[in-house]
Structures are given as structure tokens and as C-alpha cells.
């Protein structure tokens, strides 16, 4: 028996060679063949490829792949070392005894560094608890390091057991005694001893394995793996099927074969033999593998070069195979799109571009099928939602983008992305470890299994979000839950606080001026929402119970039981596989831990454990199903496809960022053959280049999607572009690198030849329509409305409509059109209020003022606001509440001094002439006076409604003495402003003028902003120049917003419109003596009668 080495530039040649080998039957017809594969995706492809060779008739490809066991190398190693069922030295199993050893050794002098890291010497309970929560994650990380030492440098562990520390840095001197204590605790042969015994056993006699074994598709093997394989080859035929990009490089490195694999990497000179730049920069893994392989081999076979197409990709592959660029005589043709690199604005645009490229390839080549295409992403979870949205929606997308007709199969996704119950489990752990914020619980309530459990519909969730916002829920279930943050005396803004408000709102209203303990009833709980309030309370109560069970220190089994109980209490699903998978994953965690999972764990420990368990993993079923395959770069990187797409090769993302573990002894002086994930990613790119048989498509973020700032490609991609420049006689970078515009509807996307090839780049009909519209005739921007709308039939006017219009005349125009202006979306806050800004102060003060006017004592009004949860907690909130209460109390006292008795409602019905009437109700009226009061600083928008009400009363009953008093805060701090008005001489004429303005303002936006127009009129009354004060009120500055910032004004005249938009000529019938501008004329008609009627208080 012997070791046989088979090499090829592509794995399809290796697969054919393996098929030829397996076609030679073994003596026992029932004996299984054993093939060890590097990844699940390779397994699926290899089985399909072998079925074209094995069991076929002459000239036919109708065979079957049977009698072959596909396994990964680690399962074989576990079998031959006797640890297939239970390996005490695997990182998952080793973490538990290591955790026990660490707990028992914290007081040992050698363990002081580790003990300090775990909070053993912490000076405060909070710090100690925080650091103790790292115990499992630290033990698991150290177990991984020890397993790495055992696999990649076993002599190191052997020396530590013998007391030889070698040149170990002083800051890592705690690791050898920890290792010795761990070996004593585990009680099994250390991994290096077990390894040596296994090698001796394999050399002495055959293992219980097939006589013929094959190892397929590997580009990196640890030194211990090579030693085991070498020993296994003594009594077995072991065939190594290695993809290697260059036979020339292999022969150039022949002198390195069988060399000591533990050469310091900085001393490795093998890169000098790599004459092609990509073999030098991307091929370190295969060079180091060649060094590690045994020199004694029965066969070292190169299976022949593949036929390369006469394209840029083919030239590149030929140069790599020949280990040198050979650009002479090569000229890139315009039609050659075999290598495409696309620079895009962020991940979403990369997917947009990818689907256009794929559709173009499918259109240009009718023989190309989706199964011939593979899409690989370094970060599959980032791109998976974008791919789902961009492809495969089928009938859901209707006649939209044709890429939706392509079916896509995603592989390697995290279990939390594919199983909603596991996603809920992860969210429960997050909530238990954090503050249970309003956003977190609302997000959890939107999860499909939770919605199904509690019957939350879309409208229900909108209502719940409104309740949470208005009841001022921020974070924490109750004061007890806040104890660890030192806020157990603060009940405000907790879920208990907000739910009490919601539930009391079922039975009583806020206006009842009653509360239960700290609960002020919430007004917005209608009688048709009582059941929803109960379901919300049930959801929060169950979640509180579950989170309470996810705390403290307890064994692993207790944690998993508590988490499973939480899932049962909070979710419902009709898909049995989801719950079965949860049970299976939890059982797998317990099985891995076995009887060693006795140490007590804390919540961060459990999160670290489950994060690893639920991470993305390859599965055989999701590869090569006839659809477009999307996966990470690991499982399919060496599987030949006609089109290979690499998406997301962004700088900082690829290669994966590698932060050396400060506790890793190997990282201090890495040796050849030892794993380096950045070098591994570079090898993945080299493998992917060789796997593309027709087209290589690469996308990356070449510009920031928000700022447009250019961004460089990933370094390996830049090296590929440099190599391509050396592949032909003239540089080709500018021809293969396509820089895409930000928007998919940019005219470049629809212009033939503007981006790629001679055809339009996009296949999206919507993008075409948008581009055509954008490229249409451009006209200068026009006004929002070019002229007045037709006058509606004259009709009666209600006082309520008139008052609404004069709150904001321009907004009144849009309201007449039923046009909704943009508004700020109210968001859910997660932070307890610690300060009260101007808007919040006005809201609180206005409420307190209204409560006092209704007869509530000022202290009770402040208490009511305290129970609302809008004020900061503790003394800060009390102080602010008193300040606001005092101002509101003074305003209320000033108003109540003029409000004798109960206010009366006066119905009015005024004949305006020409068959029109103004009708409505003025309330409240105290005797012959209306008294309005606001917490705001008294402004034109406050006095105008009072004036209109006064004029209406005077027109209704002209013989009675009427007046209107307006009270508010003065511009001078802590003073009260009062303005008194008496009726005009002819109130009906004033009403007619107001109605004329109302009619005009419903036909077009009137240049009549209230503050600006009032400032103009006041300046005219005082004999001053009206332009400066009016301009100051209109324009926004850095200290205050102006009228130009109002949403209605922005919509009518544009953002930051100049003051001159208000200064047109008066229309016919609007003229006023002395006014040459429309603003001046309208301001005079509206404000001068009011100003003339102002008296003294």
C-alpha cells in the first residue's frame, strides 16, 4: 500500500481521475469506497460528477454514484483515533473541564493574570459580576487555542508537560501550568500522546477502514493531519486529489517537498519560486501544503492541463498554470467580457448590478443555465436579504424585473436567519442581558411566531407602538428589574408603569383627574381595544417571567430548559420542523457538553455558547439543486462553473479581518502550514479564479452610497487587477473595471454601449421608464401653482373652518385640497428623559395650564405630569416640574382673574351679504369677554383666533360690549403678557374681509405667513420701514426657525425661499392704499383692524 498524489489545475479533472480509479472495482463487491471532501458543496458536486462516470454504458452518461461514503477529514481522524463518539480534547468538550480548572485555580500565583481578567480581584461587585460573565467565553477561547496547539504544533504541548517552556513570552507563562492542570483533570491521554499512539498503531497494521481511500479537494492540511495520512498509507492505498493552480510552480518547489513543516513563516522563501504575481500573493496555502506533504510517494501524478479559452480569463489561467505572465501577442478584444469587475455604491447596488450582468450572460448564451452559475459572498448574511429581494420573487413581482424569474438557493446562512424560533431565542437572550427597551420588545412582538401566539395584526402593532410612545415606556420591566443599574427606586418609564397607564385607561379617561397609585390613565385606549390591551399585558408579563428565568448562575441544562420554556410561552408556529430544530440544537449542545457541563454559567456565558452553535454552517441539501446557488466562499470555491460571481469583495471585508489573539502562542511566531484566515481567504480567491471556465464576475463597493466618496477595492482584488494588466500587451484595467452610477435609472444603464457591451446594461423596464423621464426635456422649475384655482361656488362658512384656516393660511390651502403635508414621524424613545427641551416644556406646561383651568390644584397638576412619565426622574424632574408648574400657575391665575363663573357658549349666525352666512359657536365667553391663555410666548397665531371670535360676537350682537383678552408668556422671562381687544366699528365688514381672504386662500397659497405679515403690519402702524422686521421673521437663522421653514411654505415656495417670493404685486381687488406689495396689502387687510382695536389691560 502507498500514498498516491494526483494533481490538476481544476477539480473536474480530479473528479474524472477519481471516477476512473473508482471504476476499478475492489475485490469485495459490497465494500464501500471512502472519499474525504473539504466541504459539503464539493460533496454534492462530486457525487453528481461521478454519476456521469460510474455505472455508465458505453458512450452514455446515465450512471449512478453509489457505494461511496463521503466524509470530512475530521470524522476520519476521529474514527482512527477512537474519538468518533466522544473526543474529550475537542474545543467544545474541552471548554467544560477547562472552566472547572480555571475556577479551581484562581488563587494560584501562576493564574493571577487570568484571575484578574475574570474579576477574581475586582474591587466592586458590579465589576466582578461583569467579568465573571466572561468565564465560559474565555474557557471556550482557550480550549480552541489548546486544540489549535495540539493540531498544528503538538510538540509545544509535549514540552509544557515536561516542564520545558522554551522561549515562551513572559505574559503567556500562565498557559503551561493551566495545560498541566487540565491534562490532570481530563484524565485521558493528551492529544499529542494519543496522536503518537495512533501513528504507531497505523504503521503496525491496517485500520478498520476500506483498503482504498481518497482525500479530495484540499488546499491546506495541518501537520498532524499529514502525519496521520502518511501513517495510514502504510497499509492502505491513500489517494490525495489536490487542486493546484500550477504544475510549473509545483516542479519549481520540488526541493521543498517533505521539508520540516514547522519552519518559521518569516524564513520561508518559497514565494521566490512563484513567478506569477497571483501565485506569489494568493497562493501561500498551496505552497505550504506542498512543503508539508511527505516526500515518499508511490505516485506524483499531474493529470494534465485544461484547455483554456482564448479570452482574458483563459490567458490569466494559462499564465497562472505556467507560473509566469506571457503578455506578448495578446490584445483584449472589445467583445471579451470573460473578466468583469464592477465598482458599485454599496451592497444593494452590487446586487442590482449582479442581476443585470447575469441576465446579460444568459441572454448572450442560450446554452448557459442558472445551474452553471455560482454566486459567492464573503458575508452571506449581509447580502442574503438583498438577493432574496432582487431574485426569485416570481409571480409576486409581476411584470417587474426579469431576474425575479430566476430561482435562487441560499446556503450557509445562520440558523437564526432561517428558523424564526431560534431568532426569538437569540432575541430573548439579548433582552435578558440588556435593559428590555421599548424598541427591543416591539421588535420581538413583530416576530412572526410571537404575532401568531398573541394574535397581533399589523394594525394592532401600530396601536401598541402608539401606546408605548404615549405612555412613555422607555426601558426596564419594573423597578426591581432596574436594580442592577442602580435605579430600583424609579418606577417611571418602565413597562409596568406604562402598562398600568394603558390598563387604567380602559376604565377611565385622563380627564377624570383621577389616578391609581402611580398610574395616570392613558386617553387613547378605546373600548374596541380592550382585548388588545389585555394581550399586550399578557405578552409583557410572560416575557418578564421568561427574562426572570434567564438570570443568575445555573448549570447549562437549566439554562436551556428556561430558554425552551420561554420559546413555548411566547411563540406559536404551524411548521413542526422549526420547533424540532430548536429541540435538536439544544440537545446537540447538551450532547457536546455531556457530563462535563456541571459548572455554573451566567447569561453572557450562555450567549457565547449559543452564538457559536447557531452560526452559519454549510448543508449538503442547498448546493447544486439546478437553481442559482448563493453561498459563502468556502464550500464551492474550487468547483468548476461556467460563471463564477464573487460579490462583496470590499476593502475591510475581504480578506476577513484577523485580529491576532493576544493569548495565542502560535501567533507570536507563526510557522508554515499553520492556519491564517487572511491567507486562507486569498487562497479562496485563487481557487475561484481557476474554477471559472467561461466568465469571472466580481463586484465591490467602489464608492460610498451616501457621500459618493471613492473607496478602494480589497487588496487581493487590486492585486488581481494588477495581474490582469500584465496578462496582455497593454493594460486592461480601464476596460474590465466598470464604475457604475449610483442610481439604477441613470441614463448610462439604458444607453447602448455606455457601460458594458454594445447593448443597454439594464433589463429593468422600470429603470428604462425612469431614465427616459429623467432625460426628457428639462424646463426651469416652476412655481408650485402657476395661477389661482377656479373659484368654488359661494357657500356658507363655519366659524371652525375660518379659525382653522387662519392658524396657517398656506396650510389652509393644502387642507382645502385634501393634500397631506410631510410630517415628522414620531419615534419610540429608549432613554429615560434626563432633560426637557423647549418643545417638551411647552407640551408639559400647556397640559398643566389646561388642568389648572379645569380646576385642578397646581400641585395635583404637577403630580399628574409626574405620573405621565415625561419629566426626568428624581430631584431633577421635581425641580423642572416645579418650575413649569409655577409658570403655568401664574398664567392660570391671570386668566382665572378674568374668568368669572362658568364660561358660556354663544351660537352665532351672521349674514355676510350676497346670500352667505357665517355660523358657529364661540366658547367659552365670560360675561362679555373671551379669555384665552397659552403657555407659549404670546404670538400672532394666539391673538388672531381671539380676535376673530370677538368680531363674530360683535357682529352677532352689536349692541353689547364685547372684549377679548389674550394671556401668555412674555418675551421677557417669567413675565406675563396680556393683550386686550375691543370690537371694530363695523364688525360685519371685518368678517367679510376675513371671508374674502379665506376664499382667496383656498384658491392659491397666499403670501400671508402670520409672524411675517404681522411684523409688517405693526411696522406700518408705527410708521417704520416694514421690510427689516418682516424679513427677520421670514428668514431662518441658526438661533431660531423662521416662517420660511414651515412645511406648508416649503411646499408652496421651496426650501429656504427668499423673502422676495412674498413681494409680488397685489391682485385686482386686493389693493390697499400705501402698499405696493402683495404681502403688504394682505397684511394690512388682516392685521390693521386688529391692531387698531387693541386697548390697554
UniProtKB/Swiss-Prot annotation:
GO terms for cellular component: exodeoxyribonuclease V complex; extracellular region; peptidoglycan-based cell wall; plasma membrane. Heterotrimer of RecB, RecC and RecD. All subunits contribute to DNA-binding. GO terms for molecular function: ATP binding; DNA binding; DNA helicase activity; exodeoxyribonuclease V activity. A helicase/nuclease that prepares dsDNA breaks (DSB) for recombinational DNA repair. Binds to DSBs and unwinds DNA via a highly rapid and processive ATP-dependent bidirectional helicase activity. Holoenzyme degrades any linearized DNA that is unable to undergo homologous recombination. In the holoenzyme this subunit recognizes the wild-type Chi sequence, and when added to isolated RecB increases its ATP-dependent helicase processivity. Unlike the case in E.coli, suppresses RecA-dependent homologous recombination, is instead required for single-strand annealing pathway repair of DSB. NCBIfam families: recC. This is RecBCD enzyme subunit RecC. SUPFAM superfamilies: P-loop containing nucleoside triphosphate hydrolases (SSF52540), Restriction endonuclease-like (SSF52980). Keywords: ATP-binding, DNA damage, DNA repair, DNA-binding, Exonuclease, Helicase, Hydrolase, Nuclease, Nucleotide-binding. Disulfide bonds: none annotated. It comes from Mycobacterium tuberculosis (strain ATCC 25618 / H37Rv). The keyword ATP-binding applies. Coiled coil: none annotated. Pfam families: Exonuc_V_gamma, RecC_C. InterPro entries: DExx_box_DNA_helicase_dom_sf (IPR013986), P-loop_NTPase (IPR027417), RecC (IPR006697), RecC_C (IPR041500), Restrct_endonuc-II-like (IPR011335). HAMAP family: RecC (MF_01486). In the RecBCD complex, RecB has a slow 3'-5' helicase, an exonuclease activity and loads RecA onto ssDNA, RecD has a fast 5'-3' helicase activity, while RecC stimulates the ATPase and processivity of the RecB helicase and contributes to recognition of the Chi site. One of its GO terms (biological process) is DNA recombination. Belongs to the RecC family.
Amino acid at each position: 500500500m502507498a500514498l498516491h498524489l494526483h494533481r490538476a489545475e481544476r477539480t473536474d479533472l480530479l473528479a474524472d481521475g477519481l471516477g476512473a480509479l473508482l471504476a476499478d472495482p475492489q475485490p469485495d463487491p459490497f465494500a464501500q469506497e471512502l472519499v474525504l471532501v473539504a466541504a459539503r458543496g464539493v460533496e454534492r458536486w462530486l457525487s453528481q460528477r461521478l454519476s456521469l462516470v460510474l455505472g455508465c454504458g458505453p458512450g452514455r452518461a446515465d450512471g449512478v454514484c453509489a457505494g461511496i461514503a463521503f466524509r470530512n477529514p475530521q470524522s476520519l481522524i476521529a474514527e482512527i483515533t477512537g474519538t468518533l463518539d466522544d473526543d474529550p480534547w475537542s474545543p467544545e468538550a474541552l471548554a467544560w473541564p477547562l472552566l472547572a480548572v480555571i475556577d479551581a485555580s484562581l488563587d494560584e500565583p501562576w493564574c493571577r493574570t487570568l484571575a484578574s481578567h475574570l474579576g477574581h480581584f475586582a474591587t466592586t461587585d458590579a465589576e466582578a459580576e461583569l467579568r465573571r460573565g466572561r468565564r465560559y467565553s474565555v474557557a471556550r477561547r482557550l480550549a480552541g487555542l489548546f486544540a489549535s496547539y495540539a493540531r498544528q504544533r503538538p510538540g509545544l504541548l509535549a514540552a509544557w508537560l515536561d516542564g520545558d517552556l522554551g522561549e515562551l513570552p513572559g505574559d503567556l507563562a500562565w498557559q503551561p501550568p493551566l495545560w498541566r492542570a487540565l491534562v490532570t483533570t481530563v484524565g485521558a491521554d493528551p492529544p499529542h500522546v494519543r496522536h503518537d499512539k495512533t501513528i504507531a498503531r497505523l504503521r503496525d497494521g491496517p485500520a478498520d477502514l476500506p483498503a482504498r481511500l481518497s482525500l479530495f479537494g484540499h488546499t491546506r492540511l495541518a501537520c498532524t493531519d499529514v502525519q496521520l495520512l502518511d501513517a495510514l498509507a502504510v497499509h492502505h492505498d491513500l489517494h490525495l486529489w489536490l487542486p493546484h493552480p500550477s504544475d510549473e510552480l509545483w516542479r519549481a518547489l520540488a526541493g521543498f517537498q517533505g521539508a520540516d513543516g514547522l519552519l518559521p513563516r518569516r524564513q520561508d522563501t518559497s514565494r521566490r519560486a512563484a513567478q506569477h504575481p497571483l501565485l506569489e500573493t494568493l497562493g501561500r496555502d498551496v505552497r505550504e501544503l506542498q512543503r508539508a506533504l511527505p516526500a515518499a510517494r508511490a505516485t506524483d501524478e499531474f493529470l494534465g492541463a485544461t484547455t483554456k479559452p482564448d479570452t482574458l480569463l483563459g490567458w490569466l489561467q494559462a499564465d497562472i498554470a505556467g507560473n509566469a505572465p506571457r503578455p506578448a501577442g495578446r490584445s483584449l478584444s472589445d467583445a471579451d467580457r470573460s473578466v468583469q469587475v464592477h465598482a458599485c455604491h454599496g451592497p444593494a447596488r452590487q446586487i442590482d448590478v449582479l442581476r443585470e450582468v447575469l441576465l446579460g450572460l444568459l441572454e448572450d448564451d442560450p446554452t448557459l443555465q442558472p445551474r452553471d452559475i455560482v454566486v459567492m459572498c464573503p458575508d452571506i448574511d449581509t447580502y442574503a436579504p438583498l438577493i432574496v429581494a432582487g431574485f426569485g420573487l416570481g409571480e409576486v413581482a409581476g411584470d417587474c424585473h426579469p431576474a425575479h424569474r430566476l430561482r435562487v438557493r441560499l446556503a450557509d446562512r445562520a440558523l437564526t436567519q432561517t428558523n424564526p424560533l431560534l431568532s426569538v431565542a437569540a432575541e430573548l437572550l439579548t433582552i435578558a442581558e440588556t435593559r428590555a427597551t421599548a424598541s427591543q420588545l416591539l421588535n420581538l412582538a413583530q416576530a412572526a411566531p410571537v404575532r401568531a401566539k398573541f394574535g397581533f395584526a399589523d394594525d394592532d402593532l401600530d396601536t401598541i407602538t402608539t401606546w408605548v410612545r404615549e405612555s412613555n415606556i422607555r426601558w426596564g420591566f419594573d423597578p426591581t428589574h432596574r436594580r442592577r443599574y442602580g435605579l430600583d427606586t424609579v418606577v417611571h418609564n418602565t413597562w409596568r408603569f406604562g402598562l398600568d397607564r394603558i390598563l387604567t385607561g380602559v376604565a377611565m379617561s385622563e380627564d377624570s383627574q383621577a389616578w391609581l397609585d402611580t398610574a395616570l390613565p392613558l386617553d387613547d385606549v378605546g373600548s374596541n381595544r380592550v382585548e388588545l390591551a389585555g394581550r399586550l399585558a399578557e405578552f409583557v408579563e410572560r416575557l418578564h417571567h421568561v427574562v426572570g428565568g434567564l438570570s443568575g448562575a445555573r448549570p447549562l441544562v437549566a439554562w436551556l430548559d428556561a430558554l425552551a420554556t420561554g420559546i413555548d410561552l411566547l411563540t406559536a408556529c404551524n411548521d413542526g420542523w422549526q420547533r424540532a430544530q430548536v429541540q435538536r440544537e439544544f440537545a446537540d449542545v447538551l450532547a457536546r457538553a455531556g457530563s462535563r457541563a456541571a459548572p455554573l454559567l451566567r447569561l453572557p456565558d450562555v450567549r457565547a455558547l449559543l452564538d457559536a452553535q447557531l452560526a452559519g454552517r454549510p448543508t449538503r441539501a442547498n448546493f447544486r439543486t439546478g437553481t442559482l446557488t448563493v453561498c459563502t466562499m468556502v464550500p464551492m470555491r474550487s468547483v468548476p462553473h461556467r460563471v463564477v460571481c464573487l460579490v462583496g469583495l470590499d476593502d475591510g471585508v475581504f480578506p476577513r479581518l484577523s485580529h491576532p489573539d493576544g493569548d495565542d502562542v502560535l501567533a507570536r511566531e507563526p510557522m508554515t502550514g499553520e492556519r491564517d484566515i487572511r491567507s486562507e481567504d486569498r487562497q479562496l480567491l485563487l481557487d475561484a479564479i481557476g474554477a471559472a471556465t467561461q466568465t469571472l464576475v466580481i463586484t465591490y463597493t467602489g464608492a460610498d452610497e451616501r457621500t459618493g466618496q471613492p473607496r478602494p477595492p480589497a487588496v487581493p482584488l487590486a492585486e488581481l487587477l494588477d495581474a490582469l494588466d500584465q496578462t496582455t500587451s497593454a493594460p486592461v484595467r480601464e476596460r474590465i473595471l466598470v464604475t457604475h452610477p449610483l442610481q439604477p435609472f441613470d441614463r448610462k444603464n439604458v444607453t447602448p454601449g455606455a457601460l458594458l457591451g454594445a447593448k443597454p446594461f439594464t433589463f429593468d423596464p422600470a429603470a428604462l421608464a425612469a431614465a427616459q423621464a429623467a432625460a426628457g426635456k428639462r424646463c426651469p422649475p416652476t412655481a408650485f401653482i402657476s395661477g389661482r384655482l377656479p373659484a368654488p361656488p359661494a357657500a356658507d362658512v363655519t366659524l371652525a373652518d375660518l379659525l382653522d384656516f387662519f392658524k396657517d393660511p398656506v396650510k389652509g390651502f393644502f387642507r382645502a385640497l385634501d393634500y397631506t403635508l410631510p410630517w415628522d414621524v414620531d419615534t419610540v424613545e429608549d432613554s429615560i428623559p434626563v432633560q426637557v427641551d423647549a418643545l417638551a416644556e411647552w407640551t408639559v406646561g400647556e397640559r398643566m395650564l389646561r388642568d389648572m383651568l379645569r380646576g385642578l390644584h397646581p400641585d395635583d397638576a404637577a403630580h399628574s405630569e409626574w405620573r405621565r412619565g415625561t419629566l426626568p426622574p428624581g430631584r431633577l424632574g421635581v425641580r423642572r416640574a416645579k418650575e413649569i408648574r409655577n409658570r403655568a400657575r401664574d398664567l392660570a391665575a391671570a386668566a382665572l382673574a378674568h374668568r368669572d363663573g362658568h364660561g358660556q357658549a354663544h351660537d352665532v349666525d351672521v349674514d355676510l351679504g350676497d346670500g352667505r352666512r357665517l355660523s358657529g359657536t364661540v366658547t367659552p365667553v365670560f360675561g362679555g369677554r373671551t379669555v384665552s391663555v397659552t403657555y407659549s410666548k404670546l404670538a400672532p397665531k394666539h391673538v388672531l383666533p381671539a380676535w376673530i371670535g370677538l368680531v363674530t360676537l360683535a357682529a352677532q350682537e352689536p349692541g353689547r360690549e364685547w372684549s377679548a383678552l389674550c394671556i401668555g408668556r412674555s418675551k421677557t422671562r417669567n413675565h406675563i403678557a396680556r393683550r386686550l381687544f375691543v370690537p371694530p366699528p363695523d364688525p360685519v365688514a371685518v368678517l367679510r374681509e376675513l371671508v374674502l381672504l379665506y376664499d382667496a386662500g383656498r384658491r392659491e397659497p397666499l403670501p400671508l405667513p402670520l409672524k411675517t405679515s404681522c411684523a409688517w403690519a405693526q411696522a406700518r402702524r408705527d410708521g417704520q420701514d416694514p421690510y427689516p422686521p418682516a424679513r427677520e421673521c421670514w428668514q431662518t437663522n441658526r438661533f431660531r426657525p423662521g416662517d420660511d421653514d414651515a412645511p406648508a411654505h416649503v411646499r408652496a415656495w421651496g426650501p429656504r425661499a427668499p423673502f422676495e417670493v412674498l413681494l409680488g404685486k397685489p391682485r385686482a381687488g386686493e389693493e390697499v392704499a400705501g402698499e405696493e406689495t402683495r404681502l403688504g396689502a394682505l397684511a394690512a387687510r388682516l392685521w390693521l383692524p386688529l391692531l387698531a382695536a387693541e386697548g390697554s389691560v
